[in-house]
Amino acid sequence: MVDSHLAEFRGTVIDSLAQGKGAIPKIKNLSARRITLNLPSPVVLGQYVIRSRGFAVVTVELADGSKGQSFGLDRGTPVADTVNTLIAEPYKEIFDGDPINTFDAILRRMSAPLSSGASLRGLSLVDLATHDAVARHKGTTVVESFGKKDKEHPMWAVVGYPPSRGPEDIAWEVKAAVAAGAVGVKLPVGANPKLTRERLEAALATGLCPVSTDLAWSCRTAKEAYDVVKGLDLAWVEDPFIPGSIAELVELRRLLDVPLSSGDDETHLYHPQAFIETGALDMLRIDATCQGGLSRMVLLNEYMANSKLAISWHVYDAIHSQIASIIDSPTFSIEYSAPGASVDPLAEMILDRRQSGHTHDGKGFRLAVPDLPDLSDALAGPPRWVSYK
């Protein structure tokens, strides 16, 4: 039996998208480019060393000139090339004014190449940019184009970057993030398990807000992960293992007395079903920029809502705050990072520019993606916490 609220959601979404669907212009241009931002200091997450952050920026232009954009980390994969060579032409051909129908149709036509990796990242960004363009054509935000209203979501700050910082360098940033309006903070794994724990203890010792941790795929076994965090009163523990370690997640969840979450950057169409159907997690980590865009979130809405699992959204706050306002699953956290932190340096640059008066036009995803050269520098640290609002 379908929940009455979910039935109402389905009706609202279908009605809103169908209204004027035939009047949505065809896509004139669809393209992507890669932007690389060199980091001021390397980010070391266990064995994962990041010296630059590569982004794919997708632009969709409708025949009337309405333009939508999206961006996301490409993790060193050829996302922009995949959009330009594999996705752009069939997507333009299929597009019927409804991004959700188009997403479903292109997946059914080309599921083999589009179901994972760089191509799914590319399709996800194309989907988001198309929703942005359609909303701008309508003169609305993306939320409004779905017949919905913006909700207030808990804003969490990602602190403690670069992870080489010691525990003595944590308390000030927790205080700054809370002063800027964050309701909680999340710290990445430190240089070694001992420092990871000491950094968490330093954040908890402030007593200012809940604290969570991203173990960033640094552990091999449930016991190893448990030993890092045991006894700490954390809001949640996140991403302890590389993707594929479902059995270890189930075992770690059994050991922990705090919530377990996982799923960052898992770019395949078995996410989040693999977690939900194995009972591996207490909370989902979702990233629409690599897991199917807004359209897949809408198509999975009833399934995810019925799972009763809350969602912690992975960075890209401007995009995810609107998606979280559209779907029915409860949002536990929307996260953002400070200019100069090098967590999501393009989003940090957008936030920094906004503080300097470079604002968006209030339409679509309310993003003003800067026109950067192919190679540029990320903002230098230390992190400068400013009010998200």
Task: Walk through the language-model features, giving the residues of each.
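Hydrophobic faces of well-ordered beta-strands that scaffold small-molecule active sites
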Residues: 70, 155-158, 183-187, 211-215, ...
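C-terminal extensions of enzymes
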Residues: 5, 10, 340-389
